[in-house]
A protein has these predicted regions:
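Clamp-loader machinery-focused feature within the broader ASCE/P-loop NTPase space
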Residues: 2-161
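Conserved catalytic/switch belt of AAA+ P-loop NTPases
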Residues: 135, 163-175
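Residues immediately C-terminal
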Residues: 154-157, 172, 188
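Charged, glycine-rich active-site and insertion segments that engage polyanionic ligands
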Residues: 1-49, 57, 64-65, 175-178, ...
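Structural recognition of the conserved hydrophobic beta-strand(s) that form the central parallel beta-sheet
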Residues: 146-150, 166, 177-183
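Short, structurally constrained coil/turn elements
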Residues: 71-73, 173, 193
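Residues forming well-ordered secondary-structure scaffolds
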Residues: 125, 129, 142, 161-165, ...
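Conserved adenine-binding aromatic site and its adjacent loop/helix in ATP-hydrolyzing domains
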Residues: 132, 168, 195
Length: 369
């Protein structure tokens, strides 16, 4: 199965399998690496393996534990994700219906990215509820409690109270408990958290794996080749880009690129208004559209350096050539950094209209001056 990321990350899976066989399972691991490299899937599979009733080396997929883990419904599995701020400080009722829907979606598609609207941080209430559950005594004293924390850098958002609460768990973990933190942004974590975890560095997926995944998920050969070129080994990006026809995707890229280099104040107002609202309701779509601008800029920069843009057989190639002729001194590298800064500020929950305005102003400076 192409969805089995352990086949794409053989060296990492062998390392995790050896940990299971040794029975020297740590109390805390930190899975880090590039976006879309399969970290979440590997964390869940490792959790399934160390609770498998029939094997220490490979997941059997047949025992009751494996079946429950595959459905993400095992009583010893605790999945922590960013959630919207609740109306009260109590840990009761903090999970919106989108959380449960997302868990089901994740069980059906390992590359599904959980992104609940208005969920900007990991709540202190989630960590408090977790502590209560981890100290619960099971009648059947087998298996291991597993905590998997996705987007764990958001433990440290705001005043970092959730990160500090988790730190106490890491310092004095309950018996037979393993906490797996998963992040694309290791540098945003407290050093005290990092130092208490065994680091598992996940490399990027191969282009061959992403290509085969796209083919298995109904992309044509030409579409898969094009998407592999622009998704940069990010399986989440490949998944998102493959949801729409390539022609529509190309038109969207051109429209966004034209807007951010435009001097039309009305286009600016519409852009800032639309994407500020989108940021508040759907972080994944917000990042997706920023990525489309970055894709355009990377193509322009490659042409500038005499390389293939990846858009040779599309209508974007002539427009990119025209862009380079019109703006021969444009600093494309700095433009890309401007867009990446917006994504970084988005993770810090800063005021988005001002962030987007500053981005547009900076892009003008690096393109026109």
């Amino acid at each position: 199965m192409i969805n089995d990321v352990s086949r794409a990350q053989i060296a990492i899976w062998d390392k995790l399998s050896n940990i299971s066989v040794s029975k020297k399972i740590g109390s805390a691991y930190l899975f880090t690496g590039p976006i879309g490299s399969g970290k979440e899937t590997l964390a869940l599979k490792f959790s399934q393996l160390i609770n498998c009733e029939n094997s220490l080396k490979e997941i059997c997929y047949e025992c009751s534990s494996c079946i429950k883990f595959r459905a993400l419904q095992h009583e010893r599995l605790n999945i922590v994700v960013p959630l919207p701020t609740p109306k009260s400080a109590s840990s009761d009722g903090i999970f919106p219906k989108e959380y449960f829907e997302s868990i089901i979606a994740k069980s059906e598609d390992p590359f599904y990215k959980i992104a609940i609207p208005k969920a900007n941080r990991i709540l202190i209430q989630s960590i408090r509820a977790l502590k209560k559950k981890l100290y619960f005594k099971y009648e059947k004293d087998s298996g291991r409690n597993i905590v998997v924390i996705f987007d764990c850098e958001l433990l440290c958002s705001g005043q970092g109270e959730s990160g500090n609460a988790l730190l106490k768990l890491l310092e004095e973990p309950p018996d037979r408990t393993t906490i797996i933190l998963v992040t694309d942004h290791k540098k945003m974590l407290f050093e005290t958290i990092i130092s208490r975890c065994q680091n598992i560095e996940i490399p990027t997926l191969s282009n061959e794996y992403v290509y085969n995944w796209l083919i298995e998920n109904n992309s044509s050969n030409s579409e898969a080749e094009f998407l592999v070129m622009i998704c940069r080994a990010n399986i989440h990006r490949a998944r998102t880009l493959s949801r729409q026809p390539v022609e529509k995707l190309i038109n969207q890229i051109e429209k966004l690129a034209t807007t951010v280099v435009s001097k039309d104040s009305e286009k600016w107002r519409n852009f800032i208004s639309h994407y500020s609202r989108l940021f508040g309701t759907n972080h994944l779509d917000f990042n997706h559209h920023l990525n489309l601008i970055t894709i355009w800029m990377h193509g322009v920069n490659k042409l500038k350096q005499g390389l293939n843009s990846g858009f040779e057989n599309t209508g974007l190639q002539p427009r990119m050539i025209s862009f380079n002729k019109k703006f021969p001194k444009a600093n494309i590298f700095e433009v890309i950094l401007c867009i990446e800064d917006v994504k970084k500020h988005a993770r810090q929950n800063l005021y988005m209209p001002l962030i987007l305005l500053n981005m547009l102003i900076d892009i003008q400076k690096f393109v026109y001056e």
